Amino acid sequence: MNKRRILFVCLGNICRSPMAEYVLRHQAAERGLSHLVETASAGTSGWHDGEGMHRGTRAELKAHGIAADGFSSRKIRREDPAHYDLIIAMDDDNLAELERQFG
């Protein structure tokens, strides 16, 4: 079975979308399903490109036993919609921005 590629998207890609990315990845690993899911995240803006996760997000993940190592924020790219099977906007404003950018 092919991996399902899931992209979570919020505004800056330092809080909500990376948290969703890491939680889903962790949940899949706990259930032995990592081979079925590829997760990633991005932002609709490039304000925080290359930055790490917000410290509060990292702390919350750590409190739940989820390591948040190696994260670097990024803006959604033109090729992302073709690469991912499912893109989840973290709120209505980001959904509207995705629709504006990608139709």
Which ranges hold each PLM region?
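Conserved active-site segments centered on acidic
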Residues: M1-Y84
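Glycine/proline-rich loop-helix segments at beta-alpha junctions forming the active-site rim
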Residues: R74-G103
